[in-house]
C-alpha cells in the first residue's frame, strides 16, 4: 500500500511562480529560470511513490531539491503544481488542500521529523525532550511518561532520562531525536540528513540502529542523504535528484547495474558494488549439467550475495557452479567477479 505519493509536483520559491512553471514546461534549467525570473526552482515535475514500511532515500548533491521535496510531505514547502497524498488514519490527505485541523492532525499523528541539527531543547531533560510532542498534543502526564519510558528503552537511553541533553554526545543526542519522533506513534518518518554531522564511526553505528529499529517498528521512512554509501546501505530504493528533478529511482542493485544517465553513472562510479550484486549478476551462463557431472570447487544459488561467492573462492580456488533445480546453469571464476565489479565503470567510459 502506498504511504506517500508525489504526482507531477513542482515547488517554486518566490512570487508569480507561473512564469517559472512555463519555463519548466519548455525544458529550461534551474539556472536559466533563475536568471530570467529571479525565482528559485526547488522541484520540477516530481512523481514518486513511497510504499508502507519502505525506506526510500532521496539522494543528490547540495541544492538538488531533496530536502525541499521531503518537506512537501507535511506541507512545509511551497508546492505550486501537482498533488501530494499522504496516507492517514482517515484516508489520503493532501497537506496543501486539506483544512487546518486535518493538517494539524497529519503533523501530530501521521508524520514525524528527525533533523540534522538535533533541534533539542537544552534546558530540558532527555525525557522531557522525548515527550515534548506528546505534551503539545495534550497527552495526560501519566500516559506520556509511560510512552517516553518505552522509547528511551528502545534507544538505550533509559539511564540518561533525567540528564540535560547537553550532557550527551552527538550520537546520543540524535538518538533522543529518534525517540522523540518514535514517541508520537506516527507511521511516517521524515529524516533530513540526520547523521551527516556525526563522526563516521558514530554515523555507521546509528545507521545500524536505524535498520534494527525499522525491523521492529516497520515505519515508512523518507530519508535525505548526500552520502552514497549511507544511501545504498539503508535504502530499499533510492531516488537520485539533480537541479530539482528526479533522474532515476530504483533499488541500489538497479542503479549500480543500470545508471539512467551520465549524472547517475558519475554518482556511482566510486561505489564498491559488491554489497549490491549477486551470483546471477556476474556468472557465465553454462550448460545444464548436473552438479555431480561438472568439475567445480563449490556450488551456490543465483541469489547468493557476491561477497559470499568471494569467501567461497578464497577457501577453494577454482570456479563456483551456480545451481538451479539440481543443474549447473552457470559458473563464476575470480575473473568473472572482477569483470562484474568494474562493469558499471566500463559502461560509463563507453
What are these regions, as identified by a protein language model?
Residues 164-168, 172-174:
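Conserved ABC ATPase signature
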Residues 23-32, 87-94, 131, 135-138, ...:
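Conserved ABC ATPase "signature" region
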Residues 249-250, 258, 331:
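ABC ATPase "signature
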Residues 33-40, 92-112, 258-259:
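ABC ATPase NBD coupling module
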Residues 74:
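Helix-to-loop junction immediately C-terminal to a conserved catalytic motif
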Residues 289-318, 322-327, 332-350:
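The conserved cystathionine-beta-synthase
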Amino acid at each position: 500500500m502506498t504511504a506517500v505519493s508525489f504526482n507531477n509536483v513542482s515547488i517554486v520559491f518566490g512570487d508569480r511562480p507561473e512564469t517559472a512553471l512555463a519555463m519548466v514546461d519548455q525544458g529550461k534549467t534551474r539556472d536559466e529560470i533563475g536568471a530570467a525570473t529571479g525565482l528559485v526552482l526547488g522541484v520540477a515535475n516530481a512523481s514518486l511513490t513511497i510504499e508502507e514500511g519502505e525506506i526510500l532515500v532521496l539522494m543528490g548533491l547540495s541544492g538538488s531539491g531533496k530536502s525541499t521535496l521531503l518537506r512537501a510531505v507535511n506541507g512545509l514547502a511551497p508546492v505550486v503544481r501537482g498533488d501530494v497524498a499522504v496516507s492517514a488514519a482517515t484516508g489520503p490527505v493532501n497537506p496543501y488542500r486539506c483544512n487546518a485541523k486535518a493538517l494539524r492532525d497529519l503533523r501530530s499523528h501521521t508524520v514525524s521529523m528527525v533533523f540534522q541539527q538535533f533541534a533539542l531543547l537544552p534546558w530540558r531533560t532527555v525525557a522531557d525532550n522525548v515527550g515534548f510532542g506528546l505534551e503539545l498534543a495534550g497527552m495526560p502526564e501519566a500516559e506520556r511518561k509511560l510512552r517516553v519510558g518505552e522509547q528511551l528503552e528502545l534507544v538505550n537511553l533509559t539511564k540518561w532520562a533525567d540528564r540535560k541533553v547537553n550532557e550527551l554526545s552527538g550520537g546520543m543526542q540524535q538518538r533522543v531525536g529518534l525517540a522523540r519522533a518514535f514517541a508520537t506513534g506516527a507511521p511516517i518518518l521524515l529524516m533530513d540528513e540526520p547523521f551527516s554531522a556525526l563522526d563516521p564511526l558514530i554515523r555507521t553505528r546509528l545507521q545500524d540502529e536505524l535498520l534494527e529499529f525499522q525491523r521492529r517498528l516497520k515505519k515508512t521512512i523518507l530519508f535525505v542523504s548526500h552520502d552514497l554509501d549511507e544511501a545504498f546501505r539503508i535504502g530499499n530504493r533510492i531516488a537520485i535528484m539533480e537541479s530539482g528533478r528526479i533522474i532515476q529511482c530504483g533499488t541500489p542493485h538497479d542503479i549500480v547495474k543500470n545508471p539512467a544517465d551520465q549524472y547517475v553513472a558519475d554518482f556511482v562510479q566510486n561505489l564498491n558494488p559488491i554489497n549490491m550484486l549477486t551470483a546471477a549478476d556476474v556468472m557465465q551462463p553454462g550448460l545444464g549439467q548436473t552438479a555431480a557431472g561438472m568439475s567445480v570447487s563449490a556450488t551456490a544459488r543465483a541469489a547468493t550475495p557476491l561477497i559470499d561467492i568471494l569467501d567461497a573462492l578464497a577457501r577453494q580456488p577454482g570456479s563456483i557452479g551456480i545451481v538451479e533445480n539440481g543443474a549447473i546453469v552457470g559458473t563464476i571464476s575470480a575473473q568473472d567477479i572482477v569483470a562484474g565489479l568494474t562493469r558499471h565503470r566500463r559502461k560509463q567510459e563507453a
